[in-house]
Amino acid sequence: MNVLVINSGSSSIKYQLIDMTTEKALCSGLVERIGEGMGKLTHKIKPDTDAEEKIVLEQAFANHVEGMKKVVDLITDADKGVIADKGEIYAVGHRVLLGGEEIKQSVKIDEWAKGIIRDYIPLGPLHNPANLAGIEVAEELFPHAPSVGVFDTEFHQTMPKKAYLYPLPYDLYKTLRIRRYGFHGTSHRYITKKTAEFLGKPLDELNIITCHLGNGCSMAAVKNGRCVDTTMGITPLEGLMMGTRCGDIDPALVPFLMEKKGWSGAEIDTVMNKQSGLKGICGMNDMRDIHAAREKGDEMAELAFQMFVYRIRKYIGSFAVVVGKLDAIVFTAGIGENDDLVRAAVCKDMDILGIDIDEAVNAKRSGQARHIGKPGQRVPVLVVPTNEELEIAQTTVAVLNGKN
């Protein structure tokens, strides 16, 4: 049984074809610069294995349909294909940003679901239209294969009202659905399940803090296996300092910047989403570049690093109180899985929480879930690799089998 996972962006399609009998990717890839002149398709056969083979094509893709048609050509190619024909695709799982309160769990896509995704375009103007485009492409090219929407906000639907409401006039919530939704939910859910397995603890008894740290960053407080709070809000801008996003700020800065700089709301949104965070402080948004600059004595790179770490530490303290008895703190995603310097700085001097990491163990690289704390520490610190595509594929199968 093969499931095609699609993450459709405004000018891109990220995809992965997964064999659900082995839960391994047969192929994966990225179509870029759709509708922008010369496009690019990077296709990997047997990705992340010793037998990986990469194919790179440069050609124009007028729209998402053209891009996906080329992907189909590659995956069914007589010589390099991984399946004989597209009929071998059982289902298509879609990453969807925002389903609001109406869609509380993953659903088989129908006209009602598409209508809800469309209704939330004002709150997800970049992602929801692109997600719809991906769904429509799948419906056109794979009419035999049902589509399932797996929502970024789904895992956070268990937050209590006291956590997800903003202290604004309540009528704004009722009329405009202004509330905290949270994102990266697919990753947080996958990590929560994997942590329960790793610790040998029932999911409904698990209390953890998950730290998804990449170019985009978020954390979740998980109590009894359910999300009770998260750092992102009505958009992915709230919360931690990120690669190019500012995270938490005083909202009064918006009218202040309008007055002092003459910026429009759209211009301020661009600054806060694309020119702030690590990039705004030191001009770099890749943590590897920041570490290299720190080693050379770059004070702004050091400041950006310290600010990034400080926000994470502050939220760990906050969420520890929310969760109560902690079973683990879990790091995942690009920085969380691979950057021992960030993990060490985050966990430094956290005796009050019973955290004490082993520097030598922390510095070792591994693609497996692992402990990085010293033996006997009160709260384990774990690194657990995420796999959002597999989570989407597994959820897709569960939905179609009526088990979600």
UniProtKB/Swiss-Prot annotation:
- Binding annotation for Mg(2+): N7, E388
The note on the cofactor says: Mg(2+). Can also accept Mn(2+).
Q: Which residues bind substrate per the record? A: R95
Site (Transition state stabilizer) location in chain: H184, R245
Q: What is its EC number?
A: 2.7.2.1
InterPro entries attached to this UniProt entry? Ac/propionate_kinase, Aliphatic_acid_kin_short-chain, Aliphatic_acid_kinase_CS, ATPase_NBD
Cellular component GO terms, alphabetical: cytoplasm
Q: Does the keyword Mitochondrion apply?
A: no
The cofactor(s) it depends on are:
Mg(2+); Mn(2+)
- Cytoplasm as UniProt keyword: yes
Q: Which NCBIfam families match?
A: ackA (TIGR00016)
Q: How does it assemble?
A: Homodimer.
- Name of the protein in its database record: Acetate kinase
Organism (species): Nitratidesulfovibrio vulgaris (strain DSM 19637 / Miyazaki F) (Desulfovibrio vulgaris)
